[in-house]
């Protein structure tokens, strides 16, 4: 914001000495806004006491206040605003009793906050940035030209202080107003969702998209001009480096750089925060829809039970068996006794060791297909191997055979996209689906 030349104790003493105070209840604030609106329609910017009373009458009717004491209450309101330095009163001896009123800078500032600053305009922001860019370029050119102290004050310091800095403050104020608008939109969305959220979904989407679009327009406009503004500020800063007596310009440039960085960074941060809120609202709506489905079902079921004797019904439900995956990649061979002969050397060994031995044997035997370039039909090969082992080990042996086979090569038929035929690999219903491996 603007730089203050007074210290905190000085400002406090000044405010206490002048007895500054502002008290604006909603009816008085509405009266001030009405005065500002009517004043904006006049070319001279002046209003008579009768016009102020008419404006107060409109406000009084809107608040449904009695009209019997309208004159007294209007006079009290006008005097109170004059005392609070919101209105200036001008009287003359020639027109005694017909005073002229003008809004003070404080009154204009308050009404401007509530009226003129409430609407965001990309065109207005673009014009402000265009003016700033022009002022900065002229100041940078003047700084590079150099000159005496008067030259630096008039052509560099003054434009930066009284034009660029004020426009930066105006842009900063626009961002702060956007912050308030975001909070107001959040309150509106909360009220909509608390009432009839189904009917409010479209309204919520509109509010969310409008606010997102406004924030994005603001940030895009700032980022488009930000680099050029920073470049001109750096030009001025470079020009002051060789002058020891220009600390006041260098400090002002540093403040402007910090202010511009803060404006751009907060714009992006505001967008990020709004995106997070947008996702939160959509998540809430999806959750509410899911919960509402359950509530609708429960309500219908409750009504059906209550009216069962008048309208009998039958309930059919399906309870499918759960599918359990009994396969385990690290599962050992079954411990129970199985039929068939097993070599004594392998009887008490762990399956991992058995698997290594089987893999080595099968790899050596399958290598013949690759050496001779003979097609390898997995269905026939697996069936041949499984016939040598008991049923309890068929799954493990088949997995080893297939693992070793696919390492040798691929089936060209796999690239056609056509599925292979299922082939039985034992007498117990096990099948395998694989093309013939013909490319090693």
Swiss-Prot record:
GO terms for biological process: cell division; chromosome condensation; chromosome segregation; DNA replication. One of its GO terms (cellular component) is nucleoid. Transmembrane segments: none annotated. CDD domains: MukF_C, MukF_N. Keywords: Calcium, Cell cycle, Cell division, Chromosome partition, Cytoplasm, DNA condensation. The keyword Calcium applies. Residues 208-236 are annotated as: Leucine-zipper. The keyword Cell cycle applies. One of its GO terms (molecular function) is calcium ion binding. Its main location: cytoplasm. It is found in: Cytoplasm, Nucleoid. Pfam families: KicB, MukF_C, MukF_M. It comes from the Bacteria. Involved in chromosome condensation, segregation and cell cycle progression. May participate in facilitating chromosome segregation by condensation DNA from both sides of a centrally located replisome during cell division. Not required for mini-F plasmid partitioning. Probably acts via its interaction with MukB and MukE. Overexpression results in anucleate cells. It has a calcium binding activity. NCBIfam families: PRK05260.1. Belongs to the MukF family. This is Chromosome partition protein MukF. The gene is mukF.
